[in-house]
Amino acid sequence: MKLKDTGLTAQDIKDKVKKYMIETYERFDFIAETAEGMYLYDENGTPYLDFYAGIAVNNAGSRNPKVVAAVKDQVDDIMHTFNYPYTIPQALLAEKVCKTIGMDKIFYQNSGTEANEAMIKMARKYGIEKYGPNRYHIVTAKDGFHGRTFGAMSATGQPGNGCQVGFGPMTYGFSYAPYNDLKAFKDACTENTIAIMIEPVQGEGGVHPATPEFMKGLREFCDEKGMLLLIDEVQTGWCRTGAVMSYMNYGIKPDIVSMAKGLGGGMPIGAICATEEVSKAFSAGSHGTTFGGHPVCCAAALAEVGELLDRDLAGNAKKVGDYFTAKLEKLPHVKEVRHQGLLIGVEFDDTISGVDVKHGCFDRHMLITAIGSHIIRMVPPLIVSEEECDKAFDIIKETVESLS
């Protein structure tokens, strides 16, 4: 939809949002009217260099032509059916995903938090059915993030702050341990623990990758204790970190993995994949979703996955991510640069505000996000080139120098 076709001004649109919408976001002060590849464009055609990709969603670029074509073709055939009949996009995507990431079964959702809810439910049901009614406890990481619905929010290790504030008691059955501390995770487990749930990179927590020793140690410990390893790949999945799934960087395999964001090419879809044994915890009536596995979203995801794999965008994420982070370490006031592929966090010293850097980059027509007091996060489309990273670096450098 174009602004010129509405008879309204840009300010009219902003006013309507403020009047009618429940706002929980700090918006960029522009109207994103069109997008293509590495850029968003406002109603005047002004380009904005996109280094947030809808928060790690548009991995194969905004409005990828093959994804757009797949959506248009599917809309011409059938849009929504619920999950009573078989649909072709569901079946083809299920096979593609399971074979690509080495898992046995898939269950479709609509978002990342829904995928994590399903993962929690499956793990608890598996534990109770196999070991008895008390085997439901799950250990997650402090400062992690798993979503904003109640189960996922309760799994989020931010007690007393962050997304848990103001909602009363959290769902019972979770404990938190420090990230990358294998001993602390082992100590947090009890005879009632059925699973450890972990992000391979803590995105909202400041972009902190897990160490190989930690991830491999969790896998070995879960195997030893008859527990499940649940890996949240909502943000890290689908080539973002230099591998198709981040857990592949560690040479391990989860019992259940969640995904969303980068799977759908801009369309809302989430999923969990599980081993054959664990997947049997779900049967008719165990879980469900009206829109999960939506034919249009599955068609988009099938095209997106094809693009990611055919163009080796995992390889590009690793190559360009290494190139870009080496440059970012030369920025003034940098305390640390952390990354895995093209999931990048830059932490500045106490004199530089991450929010101020975000705003300064926006003023220079570049889009990034800020997390914490002094950290910026960048998750560009995986099609990004070294030349576009050079441009981004110059914008960030100019911004930081202006704030010094």
Question: What is each model feature region?
Answer:
Residues 1-404:
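Conserved N-terminal phosphate-binding loop of PLP-dependent enzymes in the Aspartate aminotransferase
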